[in-house]
From Swiss-Prot:
InterPro entries (UniProt xref): Acetaldehyde_dehydrogenase, Acetylaldehyde_DH_C, NAD(P)-bd_dom_sf, Semialdehyde_DH_NAD-bd
SMART domains, per the entry: Semialdhyde_dh
The protein's name: Acetaldehyde dehydrogenase 1
Organism this protein belongs to: Comamonas testosteroni
Family assignment from sequence similarity: Belongs to the acetaldehyde dehydrogenase family.
A Gene Ontology BP annotation from the UniProt entry: catabolic process
Record-linked Gene3D superfamilies: Dihydrodipicolinate Reductase, domain 2 (3.30.360.10), NAD(P)-binding Rossmann-like Domain (3.40.50.720)
NCBIfam families, sorted: ac_ald_DH_ac (TIGR03215), PRK08300.1 (NF006157)
Residues annotated for NAD(+) binding in this entry: S163, V164, G165, P166, G167, T168, R169, K170, N171, N274
Alphabetical list of CDD domains matching this protein: ALDH_C
UniProt-annotated catalytic positions: C132
């Protein structure tokens, strides 16, 4: 018997949208059927057509008439924080679950290794994947905060300039706000701060992340180390290139962890781990929601949410 698949649409045919499309094509329970853009000449739409995916260059409005006809139940938005609210409203009204890869953060934050099961149980109609820096670093903040209270969490995400598209560059302020908010809300730090560094070095450098946590009490080295290694294993289930470079290094009440993220090389080269962790997390999230839909435990209702 053939496994039934949940049909999906992707909005935004840029770096992230194209990489995500390649991952979804390998999924046992997700089937990408539409790619939505705004430029009929875009390389992303052309590539999608060559892969046998239906395309529209009329934005989300060009997709709406086909949502019911093609049975679309999940949409991924890889456009910009500025347009996400309207995209989400239009698709939620038709009973489509939205996975938000922009920093808009209309729906609850989702970091699969930390809180995916909780978000699936809540049956949210819009979940936000935070940012690439958030996906790479928040698991480490959470790994420390589940051992003991963290008064301050600071993350620095360093990414190759070549891997950062125009959408991300336009959203730098939203990136820092959304990531620092999620360091607090999902990571468990009482106060969070996020910094992104776009490195123009050639050849391009792999994504690197530095995480600093200030603990309220004296750090417990053995427990923190065990928690960090357990969390890394969880992230590696969907991002195999997630690696500890150094740490946890403890200096007074400061716990520092140094990570690197290598991508699978689906669309962009392996140095673009910042894209890979975002698209892999989004695909993992959608698969868990799809399992609930297929099992009949989550029924998508039209106009389930008004944004």
């Amino acid at each position: 018997m053939t496994q039934k698949k949940i049909k999906c649409a992707l909005i935004g045919p840029g770096n992230i949208g194209t990489d995500l499309l390649m991952k979804l094509q390998r999924s046992p329970i997700l089937e990408p059927v539409w790619m939505v853009g705004i430029d009929p000449e875009s390389d992303g739409l052309k590539r999608a057509r060559e892969m046998g995916i239906k395309t529209t260059a009329d934005g989300v409005d060009g997709l709406l008439p086909f949502v019911k006809e093609d049975g679309i139940q999940i949409a991924f938005d890889a456009t910009s924080a500025y347009v996400h609210a309207e995209n989400s409203r239009k698709l939620n009204e038709l009973g489509v679950l939205m996975i938000d890869l922009t920093p808009a953060a209309i729906g609850p934050y989702c970091v699969p290794s930390v809180n995916l099961a909780e978000k699936v149980a809540e049956k949210a109609m819009n979940v936000n994947m935070v940012t690439c820096g958030g996906q790479a670093t928040i698991p480490m903040v959470a790994a420390v905060s589940r051992v003991q209270a963290v008064s301050y969490g600071e993350i620095v995400a360093t990414v190759s300039s070549r891997s950062v598209g125009p959408g991300t560059r336009k959203n730098i302020d939203e990136f820092t706000r959304t990531t620092s908010g999620a360091v607090e809300k999902i990571g468990g730090a009482q106060k969070g701060k996020a910094i992104i560094v776009i490195n123009p070095a050639e050849p391009p450098l792999i994504m690197r992340d530095t995480i600093h946590c200030l603990t309220v009490d004296t750090p417990k080295p053995a427990e923190i180390e065990a928690s960090v290694h357990a969390m890394i294993k969880e992230v590696q289930k969907y991002v195999p290139g997630y690696k500890l470079v150094n740490g946890p290094v403890i200096d007074g009440n400061r716990v520092s962890i140094y990570m690197e993220v290598e991508g699978l090389g689906d669309y962009l080269p392996k140095y673009a781990g910042n894209l890979d962790i975002m698209t892999a997390a989004a695909a993992r999230t959608a698969e868990m929601f799809a399992e609930e839909i297929l099992a009949g435990r989550f029924e998508l209702a039209e106009a389930a949410v008004a944004v």
